[in-house]
Amino acid sequence: MKWKAILPKLTHKYNNGNHIVKIFDDGTKVKETFDPNADHFTYEYPESFDLKITDYCDAGCAYCHENSTKNGKHANLNLIHYLFATCKKGTEIAIGGGNALEHPDIELFVSYLRSLGLIPSITINQRHLQSHYHKIVKLMDNIAGIGVSLTDPNNEDDFRIINELGKNVVIHVIAGVVKPSDYKALYGRKVLILGYKDIRRGHDNLEKHSDEIKSNIEQLKKDLPMLKKRCEVISFDCLGLEQINPKEILNISDEEFNAIYQGHDYDMFDKDGNITVSTLFIDAVNMKVSRSSTAPMDKRYSFTGKEHIGELLIKSCEGYDGKGK
């Protein structure tokens, strides 16, 4: 008798800073330092980054941290084509807006990224699932995943579309916005919990509804153990980790947490001055780069699009002492 394990297929492999990165077709990522005694990773290229390609959106969310409106402008994507040609094959790019589906070049752009060996994904608002259904279906061949920002847990037509799109859909919820009445839409699904962003309309909304938002966050903390059992996967962005603290709530050991924690957006340098962050935020509408989408306005830096992607990683760290100050 012969037994053969079905192992995931290696799709990307590249060197970055002091380590090697391997990505498999099931989404698994393995990183190993060249020096087995090294206790942290350093980076010359971003491993992944968020990319805003439009400020246009008709959803009108009260907590939108990008201030997206119907008057928002689209990015000129031709200006940033060179940047992507300098990325390592296997770099993950999370495309958003605004409503990225409204960008007239979204299909060509995603196809271009794929042709370079990059791994694009896209985040959309649930409100746009039905109106942009055909475009989403076309995009699915060239994107690794789709994030759907939850707005209506009771819309059966929307969730039929989500089910049709398959296992690469992740439901996005915001700490402080998501409520217990929304939970049923999360059961059995992959979920990303985002921290509440206290900037732009998000700031105005927080001032008006501070007690409700804080109460929702506290309730989410209490319900997290139950959600962990009932959802297929739960992940967090850096702000979500800060606001919810799943390590403490779920009693995750230091060893287990360190194995899955991707690092803080603002832990930028080691003692030798090497870059220790793997991500950045690129605002292609305003041609600005920063550590994250919530960075202070005076720490968002202009770029031309003719730079090497590694230069933008360095630029995103300017003005900080390495501890986010």
Where do the language-model regions lie?
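Residue-level recognition of short loop/turn positions
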Residues: 60, 97, 285-286
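Radical SAM enzyme [4Fe-4S]-AdoMet core and its adjacent flexible, acidic
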Residues: 141-285, 289-307
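Residue-level signal for well-ordered, solvent-exposed loop/turn and beta-edge residues enriched
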Residues: 28, 62, 287-288
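Canonical Radical SAM [4Fe-4S] cluster-binding loop centered on the CxxxCxxC motif
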Residues: 36-78, 293
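Ankyrin repeat (ANK) tandem alpha-helical domains that serve as protein-protein interaction scaffolds
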Residues: 78-86, 107-111
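Cysteine/selenocysteine-centered motifs that mediate thiol-based redox chemistry or coordinate metal-sulfur cofactors
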Residues: 311-325
